Amino acid sequence: MIPMKRVHFEYIQIHLASPERIRKWGERTLSNGEVVGEVTRSETINYRTLKPEMDGLFCERIFGPVKDWECHCGQYKRVRYNTDLKNDIVCERCGVEVTESGVRRHRMGHIKLAAPVTHVWYLKGIPSYISIILGLPRKEVEGIVYYNNYETTGSKEIARFIKDKQLLERKDRKIIDQSFFSLDEESELFSGAQAIQTMLSSLDLKTTAQNIREELAATEDWSEEEEDRLRKKRNKLIKRLKIINHFLATGAKPEWMILSILPVLPPDLRPMVQLDGGQFATSDLNDLYRRVINRNNRLSKLNTMLAPEIVVRSEKRMLQEAVDALIDNGKRGRQALVGSNKIPLKSLSDIIKGKQGRFRQNLLGKRVDYSGRSVIVVGPQLKLHQCGLPKEMAIELFQPFVIHNLINQGLANNIKAAKRKLQNNDPSIWEVLKQVIQGHPVLLNRAPTLHRLGIQAFEPILVEGRAIQLHPLVCPAFNADFDGDQMAVHIPLSLEAQTEARLLMLASSNLLSPATGQPIIAPSQDMILGCYYLTTENPKFQIERGHYFSTLKDAVMAYEQKRIHLHSYIWVRFQGRIDTKSTQEEPIEIRIEESGFCSTIYRRYQYRSFKNKKELKTAATPFYNSENAYLMMNKKKMSIPQKPSLESNNLSLTATATATATATATATATATATATATATATNANDHYFVQYVRTTPGRILFNQVIHECLELNEIHP
């Protein structure tokens, strides 16, 4: 095994590569002094011998042997001759280095292009860096690159550009030097990507940046009308200055956006596999590379033959299109190249971009141990910090912990016996699993993880089924919904990881967005609708009033028994302070009943007075209807209406004139008791006062939900 050299680095920087660096990637010198690396033939393998063709896309001399320690001709075969990298053996016949076949995964080659070509990302991308740095429209630059404006051998497009105002300085600029654009109609130097390369190489970045800064400084003296008219031009100058500053900061040169040497990927990254029927399945990159090599070789041959200019230009354009298809097939509306099955070929960009690309699929989305994946469904019964974990998944993820506990508790003698219990679904494993997951958080992640809240910690709750249950309020942080989304589960193994997950990553501790500081957990959609329905007032059920309850639980129980509606007005005995808008609120009604009960009724609450504790206990029955009690009163002793009203807009009193004075005194005593707002109080005459609040069963249920959320979501690690 070849020893691997460890390289420690702090960061990775991606920038333009120079032609020398690209050549260095794909070129190396063998121990016999031979320099290899250039791919000159488009053949892949010999279909008779099934061996790679020399100097082709799978050449063993360039990329390394197909089999370990075996050369192409077979002189060195199946023997590990030497492990010293300084004295590698090279076959005298075929020139293949005798080493491991794993080198074919990282050894690159290169293609020396017969004519420069532009990189399609920098030409047709948004923004087009080549057109911005040159200060020309993108369509004009493309016209030069693809020869769309050339009909004869004369360079009409170049002549037009020389006269164009965009290539002239304002006053003190001179016409472009002869070395920049030759006026010779017969010269092919100024057509295609070679013309763009000449323009970029002659560009002085520091001088251009200074000129742009001076021009931007002059715009500060513009009037408002001129500024509105020339704002678009100012924005272009700023954009051009930013790109030039990036080139100056990184040390890259603009002409490196033009390719003269094309790198070739290692063959194991674009494999060719033989099928059962004798046919071969190959990567689309091989077809794209083959097209580039064929056109490049044909162009080289035309140059040596001194072919007509129009033929050479046509071949250069075809080479440019072939390289464009290799880098990004179908970029910016171009018709994509298709294979034999009429399906567009996958280019280098298609391989690395998107959800199925190399970065997100293979580098960021690797499969790891102690992890699982399943569809998420809503779990409204869960707390904010909880998630429902399927039993089938939990027993697999926590298997080492379960086995350890089975042995420690004496339920299994060894690991083999513990695994047998797991395979047989022994009932004892579920109790052990509950003990294991108690206090052991799990991590839930939904790809793509675009910010810190894309992965959070939860306390697992064992559930039936095969779907992960999630609290609906944590969905905005994951950008998840319940239409088939999947989430991954990861198990923190060490105590340090578990502690960090509980302290820093628990869902109930991440309520604010790290980007904006605004709450990221807020009720929405059907939750808001449900809260509104619980707390709304329904006039249809306002006539169902007069029900008295001693506790909130009794009111909820009556609702569950369907004795009252969700929106029915009820009176509930309440211990606590009542806040009202007015400190001098007048009672709506004062009622004196035959039994001696005196009720002072306000809009949202009331007080009832009793002579002794016995009457107080009688009034504190779980379900008491004041209207039914009123019908049982002795109507002969008191002149009162047949059906008293709980609320009256004109503040009318339902007691007789004789009872009015007593009621007024009672109301005064009641108003004094309002400050304390206790459930039971006494006055100077030893009358007992009970406080009631008017509400609905829906509001009681709403308050219970809010209190449960506030109390149970407080996690103490």
Swiss-Prot record:
Subcellular localization(s) per the UniProt record: Plastid, Chloroplast
Keywords tagged on the record: Chloroplast, DNA-directed RNA polymerase, Magnesium, Metal-binding, Nucleotidyltransferase, Plastid, Transcription, Transferase, Zinc
Annotated positions binding Zn(2+): C71, C73, C91, C94
One GO CC annotation: chloroplast
EC code(s) of this entry: 2.7.7.6
Pfam families: RNA_pol_Rpb1_1 (PF04997), RNA_pol_Rpb1_2 (PF00623), RNA_pol_Rpb1_3 (PF04983)
Main location, first listed in the record: plastid
Keyword Ion transport: no
Reactions catalysed, as given in the entry: RNA(n) + a ribonucleoside 5'-triphosphate = RNA(n+1) + diphosphate
GO biological process: DNA-templated transcription
Required cofactor names: Mg(2+); Zn(2+)
Co-factor remark: Binds 1 Mg(2+) ion per subunit.
Keyword Ribonucleoprotein part of the UniProt annotation: no
List of residues binding Mg(2+): D481, D483, D485
Molecular function GO labels: DNA binding; DNA-directed RNA polymerase activity; magnesium ion binding; zinc ion binding
Function: DNA-dependent RNA polymerase catalyzes the transcription of DNA into RNA using the four ribonucleoside triphosphates as substrates.
Recorded family membership: Belongs to the RNA polymerase beta' chain family. RpoC1 subfamily.
HAMAP family linked to this entry: RNApol_bact_RpoC1 (MF_01323)
Subunit annotation: In plastids the minimal PEP RNA polymerase catalytic core is composed of four subunits: alpha, beta, beta', and beta''. When a (nuclear-encoded) sigma factor is associated with the core the holoenzyme is formed, which can initiate transcription.
Protein name: DNA-directed RNA polymerase subunit beta'
Natural source organism: Chlorokybus atmophyticus (Soil alga)
Gene name per UniProt: rpoC1
